[in-house]
Amino acid sequence: MNWQSEWLRVEPIMGSRRISNFCWACITSLGALGFFLVGIPSYLGKDLIPVLPSQQIVFVPQGIVMCFYGIAGLFPSFYLWCTILWNVGSGYNIFDKREGIICLFRWGFPGENRRICIRFSMKDIQAIRVEVREAISPRRVLHMKVKGQQDVPLTRISENLTLREMEEKAAELARFLHVSMEGP
């Protein structure tokens, strides 16, 4: 869902608000809550939730371990929910021919560096490079070669584009920037 005119190209970047993150956040939250809700009643000696019987679980050591697993599981689930809420990693790439500037903007974690904006001059762009590694989980990443710096990734590693889509995206961008395209 890119937007492009003669002088400007904007590419939105999806962040943490993906279905897989929602699924993992729900799974870890429910799992941690389940462990905790089985461990606590073993200490109290009565069931809080009839579906989760805890009469057969002795508090020392099983109940303590269940509570520990429940509390420990809440940390990664809290982290996942926060990254989803803050949409960490989302942003956009702006290629502006009039100003001669490329701006890569991403949202980070709250704090002093929440807004991450990296600017390059279009004169410093040497090429657009496609990195392809075929394996069990293929890796297809679009890079921008910048003079005197490391290659800058323009797509996420987990972005599941086919090889054809990746090449088309690279070719469009290379044409827009008037630079060469390097393939695998």
From Swiss-Prot:
Pfam families: Ycf4. The keyword Thylakoid applies. It is found in: Plastid, Chloroplast thylakoid membrane. Keywords: Chloroplast, Membrane, Photosynthesis, Plastid, Thylakoid, Transmembrane, Transmembrane helix. GO terms for biological process: photosynthesis. GO terms for cellular component: chloroplast thylakoid membrane; photosystem I. NCBIfam families: PRK02542.1. PANTHER family: PHOTOSYSTEM I ASSEMBLY PROTEIN YCF4 (PTHR33288:SF4), PTHR33288. Seems to be required for the assembly of the photosystem I complex. This is Photosystem I assembly protein Ycf4. It comes from Huperzia lucidula (Shining clubmoss). The lineage of its organism: Eukaryota, Viridiplantae, Streptophyta, Embryophyta, Tracheophyta.
